[in-house]
């Protein structure tokens, strides 16, 4: 069983940015999180910060340093969790602009045990027409340039992680 932190509502504001941006705060968090995980016999930690640099999908809100600081935070957590045989996982954005702005994909790929890509809500009530919630491929009649597909995302992440 994993303990998850974050989520849409919990990611509002700058608290995660302040955490990852302060090396002492990161160290304290890692120590306290590991103690909590061990005390309650969790198998690991799932990070669901939505999203580094692009707080709740708005890439103008967070500092550019979130990308590097989040990667450092993940590395530091992994270095403590792995020797304890605990998992470190994350839920990440499927949006290209959020990935480019907020994630150091090669570093995250190295330190996360699993990454769950939130490949849903590509389309919804906010669109002026019906679309697949999680399309695998671009439909030729779709005016979207094709970034909003699971197929595009997987190719992008594989290319970035190489």
Each PLM stretch: what is its role?
Residues 1-5, 45-47, 88-90, 115-117:
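Hydrophobic faces of well-ordered beta-strands that scaffold small-molecule active sites
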Residues 52-162:
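Substrate-binding surface in catalytic domains of secreted glycosidases
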Residues 21-39, 96-107, 152-153:
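Short, acidic/polar
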Residues 1-37, 65:
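Glycan-recognition patch characteristic of GH18 chitinases/ENGases
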Residues 16-19, 46, 136:
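Generic hydrophobic, helix-prone segments enriched in Leu/Val/Ile
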